[in-house]
Amino acid sequence: MRIGRIFHFDAAHFLPGYKGKCKRLHGHTYKLEIVVEGKKKENGMVIDFNELKTIVRETVLDRLDHQNMNEIFENPTAENMAEWIFDELNKKIPLCSVRLWEGRDKWVEIEK
């Protein structure tokens, strides 16, 4: 069984060595989709939505929201950010996938 939750955060970055306009500092409103997979526990839930919210906030959002991604990642592409998010959350919850939207029409997805 899979359940999911959507989160949002704002951050700035630039892409070192990139030849296009993204070489300059700019910002995005990111949408983060987290999907957890597992069996229902005795309480009838795979994971409590509020518990999932707390884990994502403490593990990801508190560290990335309103930050300059270049101070956290050497090369803050959506792919590198999504990979880091997946790895960090996968230590704490049974992830199925992470999808990171960079704006309204661009995304990267990592699946287990």
Which residues fall in each region the model found?
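Charge-rich, low-complexity N-terminal segments
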Residues: 1-112
